[in-house]
């Protein structure tokens, strides 16, 4: 499990740095502990794996003042765990569900244990996110989404992808644009 912690940290640092996410922004984590363990999503949920990954992600985001939103599975309509103060300050709709291994998943259970005052919210519009195990985080990332290829494409048996976002380009051929801080062009 030490290797899981080390690899998770490397991936998170890579994605956070390249996404150009700012303090106060939201970052979504989608996680299948089953996929990390080499099983099909939802078939071998592991609280231990969820705790390791969420603890590392929280640590790296807290260092940067970025807020974590942990996505649950389809059985909780992909609701997300955030800190209550984040839900209130961003006027997010709080919903009533307590995650378990088979409704919400191991990452949400870990977030409930590791956060100070966790609540579930129906949806967010995050600036970036990390998807470990093909959990489909795109519905919670703001437009325009930019795929980021992480420094490692697998974590255990799980496929790893990431998304950043940028403002829409409007105005057409006559318009000038600010530099794309994600792609540096």
UniProtKB/Swiss-Prot annotation:
SUPFAM superfamilies registered for this protein in UniProt: TTHA0583/YokD-like
InterPro entries (alphabetical): Antibiotic_NAT-like, DUF436
Gene3D superfamilies registered for this protein in UniProt: Hypothetical protein TT1679
Spans traversing the lipid bilayer: none
Matches recorded under Pfam families: DUF436
Membership in a protein family: Belongs to the UPF0340 family.
Protein's recorded name: UPF0340 protein SPy_1898/M5005_Spy1614
